[in-house]
């Protein structure tokens, strides 16, 4: 079995691929900075037991992380408990992409994985919209060149900032409102957050296509909140909730 681990700012997603290269199951835990490598090992061991599998049967691991301290703990866990040196997505790893970024090391490992999976599944050119803690856009042209991207505040961050800075505005849940025009403060905030974020997504994608001359680019959405926005978007064509894990599997295979 092989583990694909995506360490994000809000959650850590672990995909388990079986001997037939199929995604067998997924574990999700909240991203916290107080767990040790031993605690992560115990958590995964428990998850495997619940699925009737053996944690020690894992023979390969790949990690994409935007949280370096937690990545180091997972690497230690793999070495101590699985006796495996994990593949870390970063400089020197074969991805099939040409990174056209001023400093290629600045491109997040999760964004690279998303781009690899999007090309494999839908071809290039393509634009990947990852809707999570931040909402990011990745632009890949027909020659598999990663041209760059856009990073915007996520919907949850924007809503939290609004509540924190405006004393009379309450905290709200991210949800699709019943109508665009709200009749209460909460309904108005829900509408502004939901439709405002969709308008931002569609507007940015449209501008990317125009500026980069990628009118035929496929637009793929992923991320923890993608399900909430993809259906209402006029630009998003495909929803791939586990795009990052798929990309990690492709990258792992390229490096064997």
Swiss-Prot record:
It catalyses: (R)-pantothenate + ATP = (R)-4'-phosphopantothenate + ADP + H(+). GO terms for molecular function: ATP binding; metal ion binding; pantothenate kinase activity. The active site is at residue 110. Gene3D superfamilies: 3.30.420.40. Transmembrane segments: none annotated. It is found in: Cytoplasm. A monovalent cation. Ammonium or potassium. InterPro entries: ATPase_NBD (IPR043129), Type_III_PanK (IPR004619). Its EC number is 2.7.1.33. Pathway: Cofactor biosynthesis; coenzyme A biosynthesis; CoA from (R)-pantothenate: step 1/5. It holds the Pfam family Pan_kinase. It is an enzyme of class 2 (transferase). ATP binds at residues 6-13, 133. Substrate binds at residues 101, 108-111, 185. Its cofactor is NH4(+); K(+). Its main location: cytoplasm. Keywords: ATP-binding, Coenzyme A biosynthesis, Cytoplasm, Kinase, Metal-binding, Nucleotide-binding, Potassium, Transferase. One of its GO terms (biological process) is coenzyme A biosynthetic process. Catalyzes the phosphorylation of pantothenate (Pan), the first step in CoA biosynthesis. Homodimer. This is Type III pantothenate kinase.
